[in-house]
Amino acid sequence: MDLSTTNAAGAVYDTYLNNFKNQDGSVNWLPVCADAHGFVVNKDLFEKYDIPLPTDYESFVSACQAFDEVGIRGFTADYYYDYTCMETLQGLSASELSSGDGRKWRTIYSDPDNTKREGLDSTVWPEAFERMEQFIQDTGLSQDDLDMNYDDVVEMYKSGKLAM
């Protein structure tokens, strides 16, 4: 179904809509006005081990550590897919990307008229990658996690080997 001529597509700025156009100009997906991120938790494991459900980053890290102490993986995701890595980085870089410098970088990066290749800068990205490095340490992610696909994660979750 081509949505390119619909009222819904007409309500989307071309800057955003262009990212969803196929080579023939058709549009099969529209960007939404919100993007939600969160974690699925195995509440039974939290209750069984009397570990409080996380409400912020600090309590998330504490929960990961508490589960590690009882031999259960606190957190992982389907990092086999590049979009999971990118979504994680996006979530961890929200404060940098919404800063003045971050908005400036995003504007230049996404400008279709910009013919100069825009890479990662040294203002916005160092802190984002430092935060990503800390997240990797806090959650115990390893090289093996890069091979975890959706089915692997679901199986760990269902078998009680994964809390989040």
Regions found by a protein language model. Give the residues of each.
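Stable alpha-helical elements in mature extracytoplasmic
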Residues: Y16, N42, D56-A63, C85-T88, ...
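Hinge/lid segment of periplasmic solute-binding proteins
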Residues: M1-H37, P52, V61, E87-T88, ...
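Short helix-initiation/N-cap motifs at beta->coil->alpha
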Residues: Y57-V61, Q143-K158
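Glycine-centered hinge/linker elements that transmit conformational signals in sensory
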Residues: A66, T107-D145
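Bilobed periplasmic-binding protein-like "clamshell/Venus-flytrap" ligand-binding domains
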Residues: N28-W29, E69-Y79
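A conserved catalytic-core signature of glycosyltransferases
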Residues: A34-A36, V41, D152
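Alpha-to-beta junction loops
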Residues: V70-G74, S159-M164
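Aromatic-glycine-rich donor-binding/catalytic loop that engages nucleotide-sugar donors
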Residues: K43-T55, D138-L141
